[in-house]
From Swiss-Prot:
GO terms for cellular component: periplasmic space. The lineage of its organism: Bacteria, Pseudomonadati, Pseudomonadota, Gammaproteobacteria, Oceanospirillales. This is Cytochrome c'. It comes from Halomonas halodenitrificans (strain ATCC 12084 / NCIMB 8669) (Paracoccus halodenitrificans). Cytochrome c' is the most widely occurring bacterial c-type cytochrome. Cytochromes c' are high-spin proteins and the heme has no sixth ligand. Their exact function is not known. Keywords: Electron transport, Heme, Iron, Metal-binding, Transport.
Length: 132
């Protein structure tokens, strides 16, 4: 695949993940009313797509590489691929845990905490590997 295609792919996949995370975060923060069915749908969707974007982070697709696409993916990813993969795994595990908690019928108070853990896993990667 061309670098441009890989960048567009991963940006789209990350956008899908953000779309799923948004309402759960809003519910967890009390900005919108908790809706168990919507929350469950979003949690399961997030877990289902959590593995998607990472294959789009390929050689030649980071900031400073020779492509014509705007990207926030820092060159640091290439310098610390192992750290980047660890962040991916943490996110995937946190998202899977959230979906499992929903399936297990956990109380909203526990789900709220787990949404926080998912968000923290997003932030941990963004802080190190995404441009401001």
């Amino acid at each position: 695949a061309e670098p441009e295609d890989a960048i567009h792919y991963r940006q789209s996949a990350l956008s899908v993940m953000g779309w799923q995370m948004g309402p759960m975060g809003a519910m967890a923060q009390g900005d919108i009313e908790y809706d168990a069915d919507e929350f469950a749908t979003r949690a399961n969707n997030l877990a289902a797509v959590a593995h998607l974007p990472w294959e789009g982070f390929t050689e030649g697709t980071l900031q400073g590489d020779d492509h014509g696409v705007e990207t926030d993916a820092l060159a640091d990813i290439g310098d610390d691929w192992e750290g980047f993969e660890e962040r991916q795994e943490t996110f995937k595990q946190e998202a899977a845990t959230l979906a499992q908690m929903v399936d297990d019928g956990e109380e909203f108070s526990a789900l709220r905490r787990q949404v926080g853990a998912v968000g923290k896993s997003c932030k941990g990667c963004h802080d190190d590997f995404r441009a401001e």
